[in-house]
Amino acid sequence: MNFIFTMKKIIIFLLTVLGLNTACSQNFENIEVKEFAELINDSNVVILDVRKADEYAEGHIKGAILIDQFQNDFVEQAKAKLPKDKTIAIYCRSGRRSANAAGKLADIGYKCVNLKGGILAWKEAKMPVLSE
């Protein structure tokens, strides 16, 4: 009797852990500046900047499309502007907004990668930015 009770507890624990692991797993990849820089040279990659327009104007990665992640219609704008057959390389200021955006887009079928550290890491690595 005690053995069965213990086994039930173990099974419930394992199922809980497996369920949490699945719920918390990312459906996109976080990559470092060097790998991001190599990736964005591929013609099958679209660069997405999810910062605000004023941040974008201060400096952005060449070729980046701007869609503010804080806009209520972010997902709708992304669907209209981003091809589903290409990898979406996403960045923001520090990597937090872009991770959020990557999760949203990956949930609707996009293949996404997120720049760890965002444009701050990009600039720190002395990578080029364009200003408007």
Regions found by a protein language model. Give the residues of each.
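Sec-dependent N-terminal signal peptides
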Residues: 10-19
